[in-house]
C-alpha cells in the first residue's frame, strides 16, 4: 500500500546541469520535481531542445523558452502567470516554481537528467506485481464533509505505466501521468497553472487516496469501478433567470467597449464564453472555440469571450487576455468583464442563476434567445468525452446557423 516513491535521483548521471554546452541547459530528457509543504514531491517530465523546454503530461506538450534572468535561468510558462527560476548545479537544476497568481506561492524545484528517456515518474521497483486500474471509477472527493463532490475517474494502464484524469461537474483535472506499483496508483501533472499529485491504494476493490495540489492543499478521495456512472448533465446546471434580459457592456482589449445586443450581432448565432486566462480548462476551451470560429465565422457565427481576470489593473487584465489570444490564435472578441471570482461573475451577469464554473458557455440563436448553457468543459485529456462534446457543439452550431 503506497509502497512506491518518486523516482530516486541517480546522482551518478547528473552531468547535464553544470557541464559545458553551447545551450543554456543540457539537451535531452529530464525528470523534474516540485516539493510541497506536505513532504510530497510532484514529479513531471520535460525535454530540453536547444534553448526551449517542453513540459510533458501524457499526450500534452507545453513549450517555453529558457532565458537568462539576473543570476539564474528562467522559464516563463505560456499564458499562465508563473515561471520556473533555477540555477545549474553539478547535480542538475535547482530553484523554485513561482505561481504569481497566488500570494507567496512558490514550490522548491529540482531536476536531473533522464538519459534513457524513461516514462516512469515514480519508482516502481524491480518486483512490481501491479493491480489493474483501467476503466471508469465513480469517485467522491472529501466524502462526508460539506465540501463533498462527485467525479468520474478515467484510468488507462499499460503494465506499470498509467494515464488518466478526473472529470467533475465544473471541468477536468486534465492530463495525468504516472505509475502503478503493486496495489497503488500514482498520478501527477504540472502545466504551469497547477501542480497535482494523486495517490491511491486499491483495497477490496475500492481505491482510497489523497489528492495534493500546489503548496499545501490536500483532500481525500475514494473510488470504485462503475462503467455506468455519469455526472449531472452539464446543460442542466446553469439556467437563465427568466425576468432578466440578456445584455451587457464591457471594455474590449483594444481600448473600446462592446455591447450585447448590438447591430453587429443582428441575425447572428452567438457563443458567450465566461472564462479566465488563468484557468487551464478555459485555455483548452479557447483553443477549441478558436477553431470553431475559423470554420463558421463566414456563415454567421460570432463568439464573445467574457474574461474574469486576477490582476487589479485593467491594463494588466488586458495584457493577460492578449497573451491568451496570441497563444491560441483566437480571432474572436474578448472583453474584460471583471475580477477572477465566481461571485463577481454572477453579479456582472444577473441574467444567470449562478456562475459555478469557469468556463461556462452560452449558446444564443439568431433571435437572441439562449438555447443552451454548458457548465464546465471536458478538455482533450478526457478522450472520448471531449470528442463527444465537441461533436455536439459542431452539430448545435450547424443547426442554429441553418434556422
Segments from the language model and where they lie:
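Structural microenvironment flanking redox-active thiols in thiol-disulfide oxidoreductases
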Residues: 284-329, 340-348
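Thiol-/selenol-based redox modules, centered on thioredoxin-like
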Residues: 357-403
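Surface-exposed beta-loop interaction hotspot
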Residues: 103-141, 233-239, 245-248
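Structural micro-motif
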Residues: 329-333, 352-362
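Short active-site neighborhood of thiol/selenol oxidoreductases, capturing the structured segment around
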Residues: 258-283, 289
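Central antiparallel beta-sheet cores of small beta-barrel/beta-sandwich binding domains
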Residues: 13-20, 24-89, 122-123, 128-202
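N-proximal helix/coil linker or "cap" segments that precede and/or mark the start of modular domains
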Residues: 212-251, 256, 263-267
Amino acid at each position: 500500500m503506497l509502497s512506491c516513491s518518486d523516482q530516486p535521483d541517480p546522482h551518478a548521471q547528473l552531468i547535464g546541469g553544470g557541464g559545458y554546452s553551447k545551450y543554456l541547459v543540457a539537451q535531452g530528457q529530464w525528470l523534474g520535481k516540485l516539493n510541497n509543504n506536505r513532504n510530497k514531491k510532484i514529479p513531471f517530465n520535460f525535454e530540453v531542445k536547444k534553448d526551449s523546454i517542453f513540459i510533458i503530461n501524457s499526450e500534452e506538450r507545453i513549450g517555453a523558452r529558457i532565458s537568462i534572468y539576473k543570476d539564474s535561468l528562467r522559464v516563463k510558462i505560456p499564458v499562465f502567470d508563473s515561471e520556473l527560476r533555477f540555477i545549474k548545479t553539478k547535480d542538475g537544476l535547482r530553484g523554485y516554481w513561482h505561481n504569481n497568481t497566488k500570494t507567496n506561492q512558490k514550490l522548491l524545484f529540482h531536476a536531473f537528467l533522464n538519459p534513457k528517456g524513461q516514462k516512469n515518474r515514480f519508482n516502481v521497483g524491480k518486483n512490481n506485481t501491479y493491480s489493474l486500474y483501467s476503466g471508469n471509477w465513480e469517485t467522491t472527493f472529501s466524502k462526508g464533509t460539506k465540501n463533498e463532490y462527485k467525479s468520474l475517474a478515467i484510468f488507462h494502464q499499460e503494465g506499470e505505466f498509467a494515464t488518466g484524469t478526473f472529470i467533475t461537474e465544473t471541468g477536468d483535472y486534465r492530463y495525468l501521468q504516472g505509475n502503478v506499483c503493486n496495489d497503488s496508483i500514482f498520478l501527477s501533472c504540472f502545466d504551469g497553472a497547477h501542480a497535482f499529485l494523486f495517490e491511491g491504494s486499491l483495497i477490496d476493490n475500492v481505491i482510497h487516496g489523497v489528492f495534493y495540489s500546489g503548496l499545501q492543499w490536500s483532500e481525500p478521495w475514494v473510488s470504485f469501478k462503475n462503467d455506468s456512472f455519469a455526472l449531472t448533465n452539464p446543460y442542466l446546471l446553469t439556467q437563465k433567470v427568466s425576468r432578466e434580459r440578456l445584455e451587457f457592456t464591457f471594455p474590449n482589449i483594444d481600448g473600446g467597449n462592446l455591447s450585447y445586443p448590438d447591430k453587429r450581432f443582428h441575425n447572428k448565432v452567438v457563443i458567450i464564453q465566461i472564462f479566465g486566462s488563468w484557468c487551464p480548462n478555459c485555455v483548452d476551451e479557447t483553443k477549441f472555440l478558436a477553431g470553431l470560429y475559423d470554420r463558421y465565422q463566414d456563415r454567421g457565427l460570432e463568439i464573445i469571450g467574457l474574461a474574469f481576470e486576477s490582476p487589479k489593473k485593467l491594463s494588466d487584465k488586458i495584457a493577460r487576455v492578449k497573451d491568451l489570444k496570441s497563444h491560441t490564435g483566437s480571432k474572436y472578441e474578448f472583453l474584460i468583464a471583471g475580477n477572477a471570482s465566481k461571485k463577481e461573475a454572477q453579479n456582472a451577469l444577473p441574467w444567470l442563476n449562478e456562475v459555478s464554473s469557469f468556463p461556462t458557455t452560452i449558446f444564443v440563436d439568431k433571435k437572441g434567445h439562449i438555447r443552451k448553457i454548458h457548465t464546465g468543459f471536458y478538455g482533450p485529456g478526457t478522450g472520448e468525452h471531449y470528442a463527444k462534446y465537441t461533436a455536439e457543439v459542431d452539430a448545435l452550431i450547424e443547426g442554429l446557423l441553418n434556422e
